[in-house]
Amino acid sequence: MNKIFRKFENKEYKLKPNDIIYTPKPVAEIMIKMCNIQPNDTVLDPSKGGGVFFDNLPECDKSYCEITENIDFFDASGKYDLIIGNPPYSLWNKWLDKTMELTDKFCYIFGIMNFTHARMARILDKGYVMTHYHLLKISYWFSHSVIVIFEKKPINTYMTKFSVSAETCYCDICGKDCGRGSKGNSYNKCYAK
């Protein structure tokens, strides 16, 4: 996977000022494929960027799409089937709260340094579970990043029995054993069955 991203290390994807990190096209393609977007889904990409998610959506009638500029994500309303993007890390907590108000499913890129116990607890406490993740290493970004999909799901017997925790999910994503069993066990605890 790293070989693919080395091809895209050029000026187009370098870090930009004002908390804007442009998402490379191959990363957007992976995210879109992971989300399994259906033809009638309403999808929101609230991040400021070059439109890489919009441009790579699966076949859809883009005449029904709306691109708005100078609109604040925090003023958005309604419900969406999916929110996808690479949000500004400086606004993570506020961004997550607004996201969870607007959707039951979201797919974001988290920098590992932003994937904290507190943020995981904030997400899990609202009834979301991690359904997919994909670890990325893009050398010109700050550190490792992870694509994560969270979905609001009813608590089921499996999750209740094993008690999903923010610590379990966080440690597994970082590739560490939390001391609660093998990494394999931690990995399974993060998934809805």
Where are these regions (language model features)?
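Class I S-adenosyl-L-methionine-dependent methyltransferase catalytic core
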Residues: 1-193
